[in-house]
Amino acid sequence: MALIHEELYKGENTDTLNFSTYIKELAENLFQTYSLSSKNIHLNMDLEENALFNMDVAVPLGIIINELVSNSLKHAFPGRDSGEVRIELRREKNGKHKKECNKVTSFILAVSDNGIGIPENLKIEVAGSLGIQLITALVHQLDGELELNRNNGAEFIIKFSVREKSNQASHPAV
């Protein structure tokens, strides 16, 4: 939360956040916190530029990313000296929620790792872990969709839509 406030005050507008910049700082801070210097775990990010989100979107997404990256760093690479955590944020082409009069943009956030993966018998819809319950609740709060891909590690895919603000013509806040 402190990082969100810091990023807000750096920007020109105090009600929207450049989310890509925030994700970079958050992920780098998490990697430092878990001090992975003895392991060769890499962070790879592919982030949409000018993804300006209001606080109703930025705060839940920030908590989701924090939970997923922390989980990868704590659990994905036991006994392994190398690996990768990847974060991707992009606008979805032909999003299902686009309307002409109320411009809504669909986004995809994917957080993945190439670690040991998540057991097939773990159903995220009924998972008992507090982290998964929190992620599920926050995705629901965003009126989004959560998908788990178990190929080559774990990949959480979150699809969500945001209404664009009409008061900024060149870089609309979403």
Residue ranges: model-predicted function:
Residues 158-174:
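C-terminal end segment of the histidine kinase catalytic
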Residues 3, 16-33, 88-94:
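Short beta-to-alpha transition helix within the HATPase_c
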Residues 82-103:
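Short beta-strand/loop element within the Bergerat-fold HATPase_c
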Residues 117, 151-157:
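Glycine-rich nucleotide-binding loop
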Residues 14-17, 36-69, 73-85, 126:
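Conserved short strand/loop->alpha-helix "switch" segment adjacent to the catalytic nucleotide/phosphoryl-transfer site
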Residues 96-132:
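Glycine-rich/acidic phosphate-handling loop/turn and adjacent ATP-lid/helix
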Residues 142-149:
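Glycine-rich ATP-binding loops of the HATPase_c
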